[in-house]
């Protein structure tokens, strides 16, 4: 993305944040969450489906508990603080702007109402689904479930509506220490350990190829 495009994006985000700050502020809940979401859709889209050019994942279809946890992680710098995590560097100030009591929970509640849509995958030619099935069943299934729908008790989000390019980027971040390395991020540390059992890029492509079959 060009420097001019980035400038325009952040100008739009700043304007949205001012609008939210100057508008009448409802109490915690869906109405407040929808108001706050005005600062989110320039990257994630009004439908929450994400934007590959900005590295913004699909958030529509994510459960409230997972959105809350990730916003908390960004807000407390457990996530997104690594100097090479450019996408995280954009998310941290967004999360830190949720300073009013109930704001974080309200926007998570609103995001959880957005209906999930099909994943926008751009790695269809990559990966061996048979090899990926073996890896998924030995590494991922315990937390993310056989059908990839996730498990709140284990802190595992659903994978069935997430874009393959985003899953690939997060596996790389977990493996490289950009994500899951903070001493207070127990869930992230668990994912980092699981990601490190995937030997190389080929193995990551394989497991993502299998996850794509769960999205059909």
Question: Where does each model-flagged region fall?
Answer:
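Bacterial N-terminal signal peptides that target proteins for export
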Residues: 1-9
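C-terminal motif of bacterial Sec signal peptides marking the signal peptidase cleavage site
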Residues: 19-21
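His/Cys-centered metal/cofactor-coordination and adjacent catalytic loops
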Residues: 23-26, 49, 58-60, 106-128, ...
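Sequence/structural segment immediately N-terminal to covalent heme-attachment motifs in c-type
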Residues: 25-49, 124-149
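The feature marks the first
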Residues: 30, 34-76
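Axial heme c-ligation environment in periplasmic c-type cytochrome domains
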Residues: 52-58, 74-104, 122, 126, ...
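Intrinsically disordered, glycine/charged-rich N-terminal periplasmic/extracytoplasmic linker segments
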Residues: 65-70, 91-134, 139-142, 165-166
């Amino acid at each position: 993305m060009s420097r001019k495009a980035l400038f325009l994006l952040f100008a739009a985000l700043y304007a949205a944040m001012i609008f939210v700050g100057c508008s009448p502020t409802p109490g915690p809940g869906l109405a407040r969450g929808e108001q706050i979401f005005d600062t989110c859709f320039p990257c994630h889209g009004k439908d929450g489906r994400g934007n590959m050019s900005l590295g913004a994942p699909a958030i529509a279809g994510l459960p409230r508990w997972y959105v809350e946890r990730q916003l908390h992680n960004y807000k407390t710098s457990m996530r997104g603080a690594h100097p090479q995590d450019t996408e995280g560097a954009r998310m941290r100030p967004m999360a830190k702007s949720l300073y009013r009591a109930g704001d974080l929970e309200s926007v998570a509640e609103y995001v959880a109402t957005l209906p999930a849509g099909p994943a926008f995958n751009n790695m269809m030619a990559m990966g061996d689904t048979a090899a990926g099935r073996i890896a998924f069943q030995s590494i991922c299934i315990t937390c993310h479930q056989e059908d990839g729908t996730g498990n709140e008790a284990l802190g595992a989000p659903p994978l069935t509506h997430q874009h393959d390019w985003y899953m690939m980027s997060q596996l790389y971040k977990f493996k490289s220490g950009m994500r899951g390395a903070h001493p207070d991020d127990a869930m992230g540390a668990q994912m980092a350990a699981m990601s490190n059992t995937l030997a190389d890029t080929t193995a990551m492509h394989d497991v993502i190829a299998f996850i794509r079959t769960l999205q059909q």
